[in-house]
Structures are given as C-alpha cells and as structure tokens.
Amino acid sequence: NVFVKIATTYTDENGNYEFSRKFSAKPRYRICFKNRVGFSIGLNLILIPASISAIGKGSSTGIDLTIDKNSDATLFRRCVVNNAAYDYFKKCQATGVTMPPKNLRFWILNILRPSSTLMMHHGALLDNKLVSKYIGKYASIVRIFAPDITIGSKDKNGDYAALYSTTVHEMAHASHFNKVGTDYWRKYATYILTSYISTGDCYGTGNGENAGYCEIGEMWAYYMENALYKERYGRNPGFGNEYWFKSQILSELEAGGISRSDILNCMGYYTNDIKILKSVLLENRADKAALIDKVFKKYGR
C-alpha cells in the first residue's frame, strides 16, 4: 500500500505560507495559480481549474523560492501576471474604482503579442470565427474554457515591467466591463478583433463602425496602465499616446482633481463615444466644467 499525504494552502501577499499538516519525508511542491481575490490563471490544456507549476521536492518544513527572469519562463510569466492582477485589485480598493467581476479567467499565450479582454467566461457573446482567428491554435478549446483575459507574452519573456503593464491594462478593461455589460462589450470587442484580423492593428483609424466604443475603452485602459506603471516605477511611460484616441485627456482630468472612480463612473452603458463622455463628465462634475472644456479642447475633442 502507498500512503499519500496532500496539503494545500494560500500564500499571503508577500509569498509567505504555512501548511496545517506536517510531513516526515520531502514532499513535492506545486504552485496552483488560483486565489481568494477573484481570478485564476490557466490553463495547462487539461481539465483543471488553473495552471499548475511543478517546483519539485523540498524540505518537509517548507521551501523558500525566489522567482525571477532567470527562472523557468512559464513560471515567471504566471507569477508576474498573478502579482499584477492582485496589485490591480488592491488599487481598486484604495481608489474606489469599480472592481473587475469575480472569477476572472486569464490565459497567457506565448504565441501572441497583443492581449485582449474578451470576457467570454462572463457572458460576452462574440463571433466564434473572429475569436478563433485571434486565438489561433487554442481555438478548439475556446468554447469549453471561455477566457476572459488573454495576455500575449511574446517578446515579453523575462520583462516584468512589460508583463505588469499589459496585465493592469487588461484589468482596467475588466473594470469597464463591469460597468457596461455584455452587449456593450460585444460591440467593442468585435471592433477590436475585426481590426486586428484585417489590418494587424487592434484599434484601426477611428472611422469604423463602433469606433467610439474603442475610443472610450482604450482611453480608460491606457490611462490606468500609465497611472499604475508610474506608481510602481516612478515615471509615466506614455503608453498609447501615439494612437488616434487620447488617454492623456483622462490623465489631465485626474491631475486637475477628478478622481479615477469619478471618471469610470462616467463610462456607463450609454457612453459610447467621446462627445457623450464629455457631456456626462460636465453633468457629473459641473464644478470642474472649466477644466473639462480646457482639456478636451487641447486634444481637439
């Protein structure tokens, strides 16, 4: 007979942990990328709820492990995405920004550069052909596992900052999704997928059908990405400043005293172009009318 003892636990935000059971022999350690906060990272192409990284045998009293860019590449990617998503949730709690929905499903795809927030697990009904063309070799399992967020990690291996900024960008989209719902998201995501498949650029030129959804969504996501990057690394990298939409508008509104939560609260279901956004901002923050007019005029809006 073979006796197998299994113990599971969660680490705290600093990576510390303690098992409730003791071992007499060296156990085999594994990290499962699922947590109490509300998201999981998967999958290993098998029927499990989240990705698992095998660490190997270690001391019966516990194992200390430092994961960096020289570690296993898959393990590093998973850890960075996990840390970034956890950090985003904490930022939402601190600032009052709407949380992403619970039970988010992440896929980390090393065959792709672009990332996306499809929100399929949360009911966004997207064209299967478009999604399949985007996901590539993972198309056969899309319908079963329905990802919410895909992180394209190609050319980002070993680059903590790049993976971090990409992840918080997509998490910002998930917060926006929680404000607007599935019908809004279908139009928005369809624009993104169609633009990427037809031109190789996710955002198009701003003239296509439903481009207004893209403008609002990407302004918010790039604004949050830049803000959180600056808080972590001490500088604003200006991600997205070259595109036809202008996330700088939101950055300058925040600098002038309009909070992140106030901005997102103006991005409800009916806010699907820049003119409506300005109108809602003026209605909700009439005390900042001069600032709003000045900033929108500065960027030709």
Give the location of each predicted region.
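Short, acidic Ser/Thr/Gly-rich low-complexity loop/linker segments typical of extracellular
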Residues: V2-N16
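Pan-zinc metallopeptidase signature
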Residues: G234-R301
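Extracellular beta-sheet/turn segments enriched in Thr/Pro/Gly and aliphatic residues
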Residues: L45-Y86, K90, V97-W107, I149-S153
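Metalloprotease/metallohydrolase-associated module, dominated by Zn2+-dependent proteases
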Residues: D201-G257
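Auxiliary, metal-adjacent structural segments of Zn-dependent hydrolase domains
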Residues: R78-A146
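Post-HEXXH active-site segment of zinc metalloproteases
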Residues: N178-G208
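Active-site scaffold of zinc-dependent metalloenzymes
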Residues: L118-G181, Y191
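Short Pro-Gly-centered beta-turn/loop motif in secreted/extracellular proteins
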Residues: E18-Y29
